[in-house]
Design a protein with these regions (language model features):
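Conserved N-terminal catalytic/coupling substructures associated with nucleotide/phosphate chemistry
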Residues: 1-138
C-alpha cells in the first residue's frame, strides 16, 4: 500500500492521468459496469508501476479537487469489489481497495499492482454495455 503522504500528494498536486483517476463516490451496484471498465482500463494501461483510483475526490476542469468524504459505515468492503471483477474479467487482476483518513475525512483508494498478464478482457457480458471479449485501456 502507498503511504498517506503519497495519497495526499496525488490529491493536491497531480491531475488525472493514465495511471490516476478520481471518483466522487464509491461504486454502488448500479455502477458496477463503471467499476469493471475502470479497473480493466487501468490494468491494461502499459505504464509501469501502480495505478490508483481515489474515491471521494472530484477533479474540477481547472484541476482543483473537491473532497466528498465517505462515511465509515458506508465503506464498501474490498471483497465485494474483488468478486465483481474476478467474475467478469480475465485473467485475474490484483488490486486492493482500502480506506484512508485525510484531514477532510475518509476516502477510498484502489491500488492496482502486479500487472503483467495483458490483455485483460471481459469474461462474459455484463449489463447492457459490456460484452464478452471486449477490452478497455486508459
Amino acid at each position: 500500500m502507498i503511504r498517506l503522504s503519497d495519497i495526499e500528494w496525488k490529491i493536491r498536486y497531480e491531475r488525472e492521468s493514465s495511471n490516476l483517476d478520481f471518483k466522487r463516490e464509491q461504486y454502488k451496484k448500479e455502477k458496477y459496469e463503471s467499476l469493471i471498465k475502470d479497473i480493466m482500463s487501468m490494468a491494461n494501461n502499459p505504464v509501469d508501476g501502480s495505478k490508483h483510483i481515489i474515491v471521494g475526490v472530484k477533479e474540477t476542469p481547472d484541476g482543483n479537487k473537491e473532497i466528498f468524504p465517505i462515511e465509515p459505515t458506508d465503506f464498501v468492503d474490498v471483497a465485494t469489489y474483488q468478486q465483481i471483477v474476478r467474475e467478469n474479467i480475465e485473467p485475474t487482476i490484483d488490486f486492493n481497495y482500502y480506506p484512508y483518513d485525510i484531514p477532510e475525512g475518509k476516502i477510498g483508494v484502489f491500488e492496482i499492482t502486479g500487472i503483467s498478464n495483458h490483455p485483460y478482457m471481459m469474461k462474459k457480458d455484463y449489463g447492457n454495455k459490456l460484452k464478452k471479449g471486449e477490452c478497455y485501456i486508459r
